């Protein structure tokens, strides 16, 4: 996560937990119209897989978080708030999340080149908390990746094992902010990809 994403997660995580969900991570993206703040929420790990995040859950969290952000104002200028379930191809934001998905296949994008590349794909072998490394099995070779050098990481679902064909990523319309407003509208966009409903 970016520094801004970490700041927002630290601010919002207690609020989201009060609503009964875990805040997995946040993306803060600058766009011509302002910014997009995308939050990923999930059911607490102890309650999985019996329960899962619904569209109504995303909308409820979006409403509560939007009102809270209006008070705290951690973001200046216009922005759109999106709340999503993680989906099968979930983003991984923390070392704990990497450890939880041991032996899963992941795609990793790096800030700086490591092991001759800025893009790696392999299975999560283990997480070394001391030193902050994620060890991946890439083409039969174990590679230690510095967690602080990871820009983005995402699970690669085994679609064939799930009996599913991969879904194309759909584009989600977001509500535009008024041009003259410096503050976000309370009408934040709550979204959930179709892939997020299936576990």
UniProtKB/Swiss-Prot annotation:
Composition bias, kind Polar residues: at what positions? 177-189
User: CDD domains of this UniProt entry?
Assistant: YlxS_C (cd01734)
Keywords of the record, alphabetical order, are: Cytoplasm, Ribosome biogenesis
The biological process GO terms on file are:
ribosomal small subunit assembly; translation
Q: What is its main location?
A: cytoplasm
Renumbered to this chain, region (Disordered) spans: 170-199
Pfam families cross-referenced by the UniProt entry: DUF150_C, RimP_N
Show the GO cellular component annotation of the record: cytosol
User: Where in or outside the cell?
Assistant: Cytoplasm
Functional note: Required for maturation of 30S ribosomal subunits.
Q: Which family does it belong to?
A: Belongs to the RimP family.
| Record protein name field | Ribosome maturation factor RimP
Q: Which gene encodes it?
A: rimP
